[in-house]
Amino acid sequence: MSSTGSSVSTSGLVLPSTPLAEPGKEVPLVVNTPNRAKPPRHWIDLSIEERVQAVKDFGVPAFRARQISAHVFERWEVDPTQWTDLPKAARQEIADAWFPVLLTKVSQQSCDRGTTVKTLWRLHGGALVESVLMYYPATRHSAARATLCLSSQAGCGMACPFCATGQGGIQRNMSTAEIVSQVLAANRLIAAGEVPGASGRVHNIVFMGMGEPMANYRSVLTAIRTLTADGPDGVGMSARALTLSTVGLVPRIKALTQEGIPVTLAVSLHAPDDELRDELIPVNRRWKVDELLDAAWHYAEKTKRRVSIEYALMKDINDQADRAAVLARQIRRRGDWTWAHVNLIPLNPTPGSRWTASRPEDQDAFVETLERWKIPVTVRDTRGSEIDGACGQLAAVGRSEGLGS
């Protein structure tokens, strides 16, 4: 029993006896995000055909469209006035028409000896978002890599009580160009030598920053297509280097399954039973655990990509060995258990939060239970907690400039 008291669910699992969302402070669940304060369209937002037409409208030959795209996606440049290979007369016109400023850097913090960098951005309209760049040096088992955790919404409408972003509510969706621009900015940061040891460009992208990516499906999907398109029309990344996270918008998972883009799907599960998950993840009241895991299994079957099951361990809430056994059974009963990999996340603290990380012995027991069931499991190497840049901590302190709290 926890210090706050507990009860037992109909399935025999321990449940907190007090509400997990503090009374009077519940944040409403918002699945359909209002598109307020939308940014102007950017070159990145245009289709290949629209880019060709855009340069023609300025009296410039069609081949210039690919030239412009090469600057953007291969050299990560976004100021046409500096591009001497474009006709001088057209540079400012193109800049004014298709290159509005989308991200303005407000602040930048680093930790882990400079290998973790969190950037606070101001968007069009004043909303604030954050992205985190993490460099991992080579080890005996893996090559060096730079991973970018990017945002897809300003705020989040999923209202998860343990997540700083979710407790701030939702302001608006981000555009495709705003999403991709975070990657270009990270590449410029690496190229400038501002991340010790890193070279080249971002190797992996995780849609695990601010927002629920599946609630901004159209912009996120177009961003993924742009990031994975061959140069000069896109950034030229492998879809397998991208991870798309969701708390469980089942219809969008089913839609993604049919897209034919083999990104890694990460399911933020955090509880294997509906009784607890209804409290931790409010969207579970709409799409239950079985529906979610069925959709995830079908995604793995269709794409041949292993699904990542994200599970933040919270002291006396969801960290019991009995729950690990339930999670293992949920995975095993859907066939070959190697379709999923459990990624355990030590809960990261947020200012004023009553949520805390599991005791080491409880975390170890959880891992051992999964291993006894032969479930692939790892404990995440948490980065950036000193600068509030770790999982669940991104809140863009101050929320916005000119939009209120």
Curated annotation (Swiss-Prot):
The lineage of its organism: Bacteria, Bacillati, Actinomycetota, Actinomycetes, Propionibacteriales. GO terms for biological process: rRNA base methylation; tRNA methylation. Its main location: cytoplasm. Reaction proceeds by a ping-pong mechanism involving intermediate methylation of a conserved cysteine residue. It comes from the Bacteria. InterPro entries: Aldolase_TIM, Methyltransferase_A, RNA_MTrfase_RlmN, rRNA_lsu_MTrfase_RlmN/Cfr, rSAM. Keywords: 4Fe-4S, Cytoplasm, Disulfide bond, Iron, Iron-sulfur, Metal-binding, Methyltransferase, rRNA processing, S-adenosyl-L-methionine, Transferase, tRNA processing. One of its GO terms (molecular function) is tRNA binding. Its EC number is 2.1.1.192. It is found in: Cytoplasm. Specifically methylates position 2 of adenine 2503 in 23S rRNA and position 2 of adenine 37 in tRNAs. Residues 142-386 form the Radical SAM core domain. The active site is at E130, C391. [4Fe-4S] cluster binds at C156, C160, C163. Its cofactor is [4Fe-4S] cluster. HAMAP family: RNA_methyltr_RlmN. This is Probable dual-specificity RNA methyltransferase RlmN.
